[in-house]
């Protein structure tokens, strides 16, 4: 039995294209892997806090007492990291907002990137500590960006996930959804076909 963690990050709730793909992924995964456990976390509701000057102090060990806000952020960080490490497959819904990932997803990454816990520095450079995982990224876009300089999402996620130790990453794209109903429908159909292949692998 595998444990699957699904991370939603769209601010559009039920109108989200990436959310629809995520729901389809969950439906197909449950059908093909009936014994697996699926956990869904919506990073936009409630939103993950922004890592600001106060909260960054909570992520670095020190002797100074933590403020209540820092204590809450540290507790959430611990919870998110424990959840991440406890799952085998990580599904990330990453719609493109202004060429990059949503703020909500970036805030999540800022809270789980902690030296000595999800990565460490060695004489040979950084080493990821979140190993043995498989990641699937579902990315919806209004335009066509795959394999072009305007796709900042795929390179960034490959680097970040690899940095914490997740190197087995598959991408599913739904592109051109702002180009009209026909293009959007084909994009969704193609993405669902790609999801079928990922689920069956």
Curated annotation (Swiss-Prot):
Coiled coil: none
Positions that bind FMN: 10, 16-18, 96-99, 140-143
Cofactor(s) required for function per UniProt: FMN
Enzyme Commission code(s) on record: 1.6.5.-, 1.7.1.17
Keyword field contains Transmembrane helix: no
Record bears the keyword Flavoprotein: yes
Record function comment: Quinone reductase that provides resistance to thiol-specific stress caused by electrophilic quinones.
Subunit structure, interactors included: Homodimer.
Protein name: FMN-dependent NADH:quinone oxidoreductase
Lineage, opening ranks: Bacteria, Pseudomonadati, Pseudomonadota, Gammaproteobacteria, Enterobacterales
Gene that encodes it: azoR
